[in-house]
Amino acid sequence: MNIVILLLILTFSIKHSNTYKLKNTYIPINYMYHNNKNILRSQKSKLFLNFLSNNQLANSNKQTCFFKSNIKSSISNIDNYDYIRKRYINTSNKNKLFYNITLRTNDGEKKIECNEDEYILDASERQNVELPYSCRGGSCSTCAAKLVEGEVDNDDQSYLDEEQIKKKYILLCTCYPKSDCVIETHKEDELHDM
């Protein structure tokens, strides 16, 4: 029943979506990301992506779904994996890996826990730590921060250039932790003064 509802929602949600060529027809694929609060953002999205990858997508070396706010997730039925980063969506907390993040904010140090598949900005909001943001898609500098210690995956962003990345600037709205981290927040002005 839930899959049928999801398919109906997808069929009727044709507004401003990126499209995919599915067996010689184009259909929109809207934002799908896990969150137990609503069906479009539930784990059912993962089931639908598997359905698309196994049954509907035209043959190609690379198929990537682009969702709202530039969030991307790769579909698993692909011949060439060299350029693909997979995101597995799972709402279960069993054996879930998380990292301790120390945020050096304008109001002092804040410590949060961030799941390995969760953006640092989302984790901070979940734990009532307010940080600046605008686009939530890695295409502006409002949530700019600087990585002091640790390692992150900031590949989902599209704003920072190579020089800024080498100087350890990150965008918290599209940044996954890969280890425990220390991060200085509120770095938008510093970023633009470079």
Swiss-Prot record:
It comes from the Eukaryota. Its cofactor is [2Fe-2S] cluster. Its main location: plastid. It is found in: Plastid, Apicoplast. Keywords: 2Fe-2S, Apicoplast, Electron transport, Iron, Iron-sulfur, Metal-binding, Plastid, Transit peptide, Transport. GO terms for biological process: electron transport chain. Signal peptide: none annotated. GO terms for cellular component: apicoplast. Residues 99-189 form the 2Fe-2S ferredoxin-type domain. [2Fe-2S] cluster binds at C135, C140, C143, C173. Belongs to the 2Fe2S plant-type ferredoxin family. NCBIfam families: fdx_plant (TIGR02008). Ferredoxins are iron-sulfur proteins that transfer electrons in a wide variety of metabolic reactions. By transferring electrons to 4-hydroxy-3-methylbut-2-enyl diphosphate reductase LytB/IspH, plays a role in the terminal step of the DOXP/MEP pathway for isoprenoid precursor biosynthesis. This is Ferredoxin, apicoplast. It comes from Plasmodium falciparum (isolate 3D7).
